[in-house]
Amino acid sequence: MVILVNFRLTSLEGIYQLVCQLEKTVFDQEAMYEVFQHAILNHSIFISKDNDRITGYLVLSITYQMHHCGKVAEVVELCVDNDFQNQKIGTDLLNHAMTYAKLQGCVNMDITTNQKRKDAHRFYRRNGLNNTHYKFTKQL
């Protein structure tokens, strides 16, 4: 059974494993811990669990944006364990985040995903999101 819970420090290792799985690399654990510390203080983090195993997580940022004349929620990260794909975990996390954002008074929700993640694009469309913007990046 999968349940949604708010982030706890005991969730760090499970989320670390999912981030490495998503990016197909092994990140430095100390550096990742520092990133976690920042995320904990500045974002809302929701996780899904099956017994004690973390099956997915979502990081949500809420900011005031002048061009929306209000608060906007942004899904900074959404990841579901490969072993738990196609079980509605991503949909549950996304719906939970949308409900939370509405309760916080957000007027919009934004999500950015890499162009190569075609499955993610289909997922977001199925869940009612529209592809309306371009995002430009430059590695520093």
Residue spans for each PLM region:
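A short beta-loop-alpha structural element at the N-terminal edge
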Residues: 1-15
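Glycine-rich phosphate/pyrophosphate-binding loop shared by adenosine-nucleotide-utilizing enzymes
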Residues: 2, 52-57, 73
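Helix-loop element at the rim of GNAT/NAT acetyltransferase active sites that forms part
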Residues: 16-30
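Active-site rim helix/loop that mediates acceptor-substrate recognition in acyltransferases
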Residues: 27-45
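Conserved beta-strand in the GNAT
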Residues: 47, 53-62, 79
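Conserved acetyl-CoA-binding loop-helix of GNAT-fold acetyltransferases
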Residues: 77-80, 86-99, 126
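Conserved active-site alpha-helix within GNAT-family acetyltransferase domains
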Residues: 91, 115-133, 138
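Conserved GNAT acetyl-CoA-binding A-motif
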Residues: 94, 101-112
